[in-house]
Amino acid sequence: MNSVVLQLSVVCLGVSSQQITDSQRLFSIAVNRVTHLYLLAQRLFSDFESSLQTEEQRQLNKIFLQDFCNSDYIISPIDKHETQRSSVLKLLSISYGLVESWEFPSRSLSGGSSLRNQISPRLSELKTGILLLIRANQDEAENYPDTDTLQHAPYGNYYQSLGGNESLRQTYELLACFKKDMHKVETYLTVAKCRLSPEANCTL
């Protein structure tokens, strides 16, 4: 009887280890993808800023600090401490919402260069990967909204009348918000991935 129990325990441990390994692999792919998007966003934003006059940069930065990104309507951890306390499923769901919120506005960032044309397809790949991770972690005992029910406010602030520098401001804000959101997703996925290694130090 004891040998049967031992064999079953070994089998269960093997299945559990395999699930963790699969999740780690999916997390590694997702983190690599969002890191690429974040670096891409940094480069595009830097290139755009370099094309502006000093006064234009100052004015646009001042306006942006007073404005909001679409992601500000998505409830997410307010600081690194809350991020570390959040569950894996919660971090994945928020990341999914952030990525999904860029499906439409990312079209405004496409075109004009090979770098910009990478954005939409890479966002789609990242969204698919995060959805797979959410499904793999759905057995977690937490009542968190399904990804299909996540609601996002319209990207209205980018399509309002912005005055004479409308095009400049819209591009500046889109690139700045895209960079900000990809950094958020990178942070959340990195912390969630770290949780799979109990001995790891997940301090931000």
Curated annotation (Swiss-Prot):
Endpoints of the signal sequence: 1-17
Keyword annotations from UniProtKB, A to Z: Disulfide bond, Hormone, Metal-binding, Pyrrolidone carboxylic acid, Secreted, Signal, Zinc
GO terms, biological process: animal organ development; growth hormone receptor signaling pathway; positive regulation of growth; positive regulation of receptor signaling pathway via JAK-STAT; response to nutrient levels
GO molecular function annotations of the record: growth hormone activity; growth hormone receptor binding; metal ion binding
Primary location group: secreted
Subcellular localization(s) per the UniProt record: Secreted
InterPro entries: 4_helix_cytokine-like_core, Somatotropin, Somatotropin/Prolactin, Somatotropin_CS
Modified residues (Pyrrolidone carboxylic acid): 18
Disulfide-linked positions: 69-177, 194-202
One GO cellular component term noted in the UniProt record for this chain: extracellular space
Keyword Signal belongs to the record: yes
Binding site for Zn(2+): 36, 186
Keyword Membrane: no
Transmembrane segments: none
Function: Growth hormone plays an important role in growth control and involved in the regulation of several anabolic processes.
Family annotation (PANTHER family): SOMATOTROPIN (PTHR11417:SF2), SOMATOTROPIN,PROLACTIN (PTHR11417)
Family: Belongs to the somatotropin/prolactin family.
Name by which UniProt lists this protein: Somatotropin
Organism lineage: Eukaryota, Metazoa, Chordata, Craniata, Vertebrata
Gene designation: gh
